[in-house]
Curated annotation (Swiss-Prot):
It comes from Ralstonia nicotianae (strain ATCC BAA-1114 / GMI1000) (Ralstonia solanacearum). ATP binds at G8, M9, S10, G11, S12, G13, K14, S15. This is Nucleotide-binding protein RSc0403. GO terms for molecular function: ATP binding; GTP binding. Displays ATPase and GTPase activities. Belongs to the RapZ-like family.
Amino acid sequence: MRIILITGMSGSGKSVALNVLEDAGYYCVDNLPAQFIPELARYLADQGYTHLGVATDIRSRESLRKVPETITQLRKEHDVRMLFLTASTNALVQRYSETRRRHPLSIRNGRPDAGNPPSAAKGPDTSLIEAIEMERELLSPLADPAHRIDTSTLRTNALRAYIKEFISDEPHDITLMFESFGFKHGVPTDADLVFDVRSLPNPYYDTQLRPLTGRDQPVIDFLQSQPMVLAMAEDIRAYVEKWLPSFIADNRSYLTVAIGCTGGQHRSVYIAERLATYFRAHGNVLVRHRELAVDA
């Protein structure tokens, strides 16, 4: 059975991810304590199910410490992947302001008194920012072994498309994610390796190329005619290829390689696509253009 375990920050898009899994034919359960997942997997396997999606988060915080042990147990019999969704504090504050919902940890002890509504909880409430940072600290041990997605700048449609791509591949040793981004919008927090290509010739200064992207042929032709661009792409390729076996030996399931230029529209997009084309011959590869997804 393939099992996708979704966890991460409240408000980061876990419900969206779980809905994508459900649409793809997964049997999905929200807010299931980790210790119950193996029993559920056995039951569903006996019933003929082949795909299970489970979301567990801070609402089940008493069981969060058991997640690593549960993952180890499940991997003895199943293909298990773990997805960790996160977002910046500013992005989460804005989302909570828009929805007017309360953060699970904004109430004293993380939950109201038994039988009372949240507003009746005794003791002072934790501020939203304090609750977010508290949750981030509590969940931090789960981020490293998971594939992380920073949804700070992702629209819902872009996140849905990314999740679809994430679950579409077959089991393998490692997934390579090549992600383009613009430094003026911040470095992706889910990146394992970051390469700065801002020193390369910039198509932005050609008025005919400015509205295009690194996936458009005129921009590709321009960049491919620049020796510096080809040399930079080759050096990054060689670095990733040289050290990829070390990441695999470290039992990594995912490696996110972020390529950044100024705006994330031309140079980084082109190089990310070029690297993805090369490494597809070596295994499973995903591509994400962060700023293009935002502008889509």
